[in-house]
Amino acid sequence: MHGGLDRAFEGLQVRLLVPDLWQQEAIRALTDGFDVIVDAPTGAGKTYIFESLIKGRKFPAAGRQAIFTVPTRALANEKWREWKRDGWKVGIATGDLAEDLDAPVLVATLETQRERFLAGEGPHLLVIDEYQMIGDRQRGLNYELAVALAPPDTRLLLLSGSVGNPGKVAAWMERLGRRVRVIGTAERPVPLDEMPVEGLPRSAPPKYRNFWHRLSLGVMLSHYGPLLIFAPHRKAAEKIAWKVAEMLPEDDPIRLGDRRLEQGCSADILRLLKKRVAFHHSGLGFLERAAVVEPLAKAGQLRIIVATMGLAAGINFSVRSVFVAGTTYQDGPYERDVSPAELLQMFGRAGRRGLDETGYIISGRDSARLSDARPLDLRRHNELDWPTMIRRMHLAGEHGVSPFDAARELRDRLFSDQTVPLGFRPAGDGDSATT
């Protein structure tokens, strides 16, 4: 009798999710009408707050919308597919894809909502994931405007684990007339430890003695895999992937078993998968990235993944160990230093909740150390964006509002301790000072 029951329930897993106290507090604050800034490490469960609000039917109200904004198109696509699989009525808006834009839940890159914010419109709930982007030189203004122009009846949920001054952001929002709570935790779900490459086992044959051979073999012999390596640019990511693959046996190759997927993958990816290795960068095709590399990485089927640092914010899977190769990375035509906050985000991918007791940061002689990672205080980098200002003034004029008053109001709502000069004097102001 008991044996039959055992067989009947064989392979059945019951997963009971009990929210942490800080998650419960954030959910309660939002339903009580507060905006919430969540300060919690990568992997702690910040997205759970949004998912709980939707599943509990607390947001959005009938006829309104909840918008979850993310910094990359890849991440938007991933969350959209995930929530559709869960049965949600969810749309997507990115620079290259727009579907079901009026769905109760919308996943979007923040820039796609720009006109909505400028028109003074807003959803019932607006989530700004990775809100540290406010400090980004290129994209920060759009993030700043989303907060500055959100209507009073839009609840804001700001998520990050790499901001050092969330209290200052809260004070700015309070200056805008909003009720705000800062909620979070400093505790990581999986603690991190640092392991120098020199401390890993060395038993490679003489011809396999370069750094990448030692790293890949040492990590596998120590059972510290899967390993995620962050590389400075695409070519480096691919080169490193081939180097680490040289040391690994082809004893358990991944076979996709789907002709469509195999045809959608390059020969390089298919060859690397035989060693359970892959690279991950913006040059991958949609099928390669979204249907092959990312799902395999999430499922723990890859030994080593080599990703570009520029895509760090778009990575949504965890591994046991992380290694950051270099201190600079390619950002479009520019080379940028890796910031301490970016390191914090990359290192945060080490340690899988429920699988690992410890996550490992592998360090080399010239690579980033765990102590190099820390939150950074946010400050605005942008000067005024005049196309945005002129658009705001034009919309104000169409509604019978003084364009100059609209410009001043927008200026005064920016994330700045000092008044940003507009540099014009409206007609009729006589000898008054330039605004």
Task: Locate predicted features.
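Helicase-associated low-complexity/disordered flanking segments
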Residues: 1-37, 57-58, 63-65, 190, ...
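Inter-Walker segment of RecA-like/P-loop motor cores
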Residues: 77-122, 181-187, 194-197
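SF2 helicase catalytic motif II
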Residues: 110-113, 117-157
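Long, largely alpha-helical accessory region at the distal end of helicase-like NTP-driven motors
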Residues: 373-435
